[in-house]
């Protein structure tokens, strides 16, 4: 009798004690909000738009070394990547900022999708986009080895892992766009291609080609 009473008292305990300003798991699952929010987080770091993130992840490094931009701020003239003496804050920023944000959001999408479906495929492509830039900056990266998630993988291993991930993504997307060339998914959350899956397919293949040329 006591056991039955205790069970009934604790039934729905977590929901009953949920703060009123916090969404429930059921509410977060509506309209793909859970996966969509993590999808946006991955986009924001694979293709940074926010001014500070863009400056530190793209502009001060690749855009200058690629001769797209030059340093106009006198404060940047003494120490920068072109002089090979960039401040430590510049050097470590992408690793400390983009890497954890991309990988944490990807893990959540991986969990929510059970490693299947279009959203998972798009997440694999975004992960490849982000990690390709990072491994070209730093070389070896911790990409989640099964034996030791904190172990650093060689750049060769990173490239091969990303290509395998992109193959998985294109295997998911290709049958969909063969059936319907204008197929879309996650339109409301897709800031890159507005859900157009054929463009995601092209991006995946472009990333594979970029790595193949470098290998």
Predicted regions and their residues:
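Structured, solvent-exposed acidic/aromatic patches
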Residues: 72-215
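Sec-dependent bacterial lipoprotein signal peptides
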Residues: 1-8
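Membrane-proximal, proline-rich intrinsically disordered regions
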Residues: 8-69
């Amino acid at each position: 009798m006591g056991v039955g009473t205790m069970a009934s008292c604790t039934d729905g305990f977590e929901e009953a004690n949920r703060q009123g300003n916090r969404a429930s798991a059921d509410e977060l699952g509506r309209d793909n909000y859970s996966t969509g929010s993590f999808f946006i987080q991955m986009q924001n770091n694979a293709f940074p738009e926010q001014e500070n993130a863009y400056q530190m992840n793209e502009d001060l490094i690749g855009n200058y070394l690629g001769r797209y931009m030059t340093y106009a701020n006198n404060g940047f003239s003494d120490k920068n990547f072109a002089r090979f003496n960039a401040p430590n804050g510049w050097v470590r920023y992408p690793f400390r900022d983009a890497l954890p944000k991309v990988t944490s959001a990807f893990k959540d999408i991986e969990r929510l999708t059970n490693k299947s479906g279009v959203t998972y495929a798009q997440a694999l492509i975004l992960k490849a986009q982000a990690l390709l830039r990072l491994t070209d900056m730093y070389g070896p990266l911790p990409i989640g080895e099964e034996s030791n998630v904190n172990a650093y993988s060689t750049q060769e291993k990173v490239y091969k892992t990303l290509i395998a991930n992109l193959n998985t993504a294109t295997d998911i997307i290709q049958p969909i766009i063969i059936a319907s060339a204008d197929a879309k998914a996650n339109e409301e959350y897709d800031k890159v291609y507005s859900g157009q899956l054929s463009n995601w397919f092209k991006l995946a293949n472009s990333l594979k080609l970029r790595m193949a040329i470098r290998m």
